[in-house]
């Protein structure tokens, strides 16, 4: 696939794609954003995406800072799924932030199981290709190995429940390295994947701000490519399924999760251009989670497209 094979953004016509794994017929890297859905997954979320000229979308299906597991609106679900399919728009779900399978608190772990199961089920209902979940931390002063054993105990059964052809992938997103994080550097994905038997429905969502804040310097002529090489060496080819394209307000290794608009932070534009030339990112969508509201989001989507196509 090359840039000349790109299809249009939301609001243009296109062929219905096969949804399971790849995004056939799309540009090398579809660029889109996380969109608000309060008031309607289709009527509000996709309307916002159209205003961004988004080629990919990410949504919440529950309050990201709570444990509620609301049922979807069947009409909105079907309209969203149909529009994404008809217009070749890959969609993703971001699971709630409170989920932590490494917690020392039994209630938190139990709620994490139900919350993620809900996100995975809702992901299938709306035709999402993947559900993003943060990798969590080892709370209560426990060893990382103990927390990872607990991750295995509770998360592996959820992966084994993904038996339908249209079930989404579970995409692990590393953190900026705050506290007792279970996964922040590229090599931390290794023990996490081992704990989950490198399950076939397991993938990675790479957040550029997080990995930069954790200590991977993405700047310079080869910083981004070296980081992606390390990731592939750790988890294998084909596991990178989604990229959260965010600049960073803070310097490399600051362990602060503060996103900035593309080119306005300490990462800068060039690493994002390099990102979209590495073999591991072929066909992988980019989702922005940057400041500035709709105007800022639209500018970031446009900027990433220019870096991709220029």
Swiss-Prot record:
GO terms, molecular function: deoxyribonuclease IV (phage-T4-induced) activity; DNA binding; DNA-(apurinic or apyrimidinic site) endonuclease activity; phosphoric diester hydrolase activity; zinc ion binding
UniProt-listed GO biological process terms: base-excision repair
Cofactor annotation comment: Binds 3 Zn(2+) ions.
Pfam families tied to this protein: AP_endonuc_2 (PF01261)
Keyword field contains Protein biosynthesis: no
SMART domains, per the entry: AP2Ec
Official protein name in the record: Probable endonuclease 4
Function: Endonuclease IV plays a role in DNA repair. It cleaves phosphodiester bonds at apurinic or apyrimidinic (AP) sites, generating a 3'-hydroxyl group and a 5'-terminal sugar phosphate.
Residues binding Zn(2+) 1: 94, 134, 173
Metal-binding found in the keyword field: yes
EC number(s) per entry: 3.1.21.2
Lineage top rank: taxon: Bacteria
UniProt xrefs under NCBIfam families: nfo (TIGR00587)
Reactions the enzyme catalyzes: Endonucleolytic cleavage to 5'-phosphooligonucleotide end-products
InterPro entries hit by this protein: AP_endonuc_2, AP_endonuc_F2_Zn_BS, Xyl_isomerase-like_sf, Xyl_isomerase-like_TIM-brl
Cofactor: Zn(2+)
Family named by the database record: Belongs to the AP endonuclease 2 family.
Source organism of the structure: Streptomyces avermitilis (strain ATCC 31267 / DSM 46492 / JCM 5070 / NBRC 14893 / NCIMB 12804 / NRRL 8165 / MA-4680)
Amino acids binding Zn(2+) 2: 173, 207, 244, 289
Binding site for Zn(2+) 3: 210, 257, 259
Region of interest called Disordered, as start-end residue ranges on this chain: 1-31
Alphabetical UniProt keywords: DNA damage, DNA repair, Endonuclease, Hydrolase, Metal-binding, Nuclease, Zinc
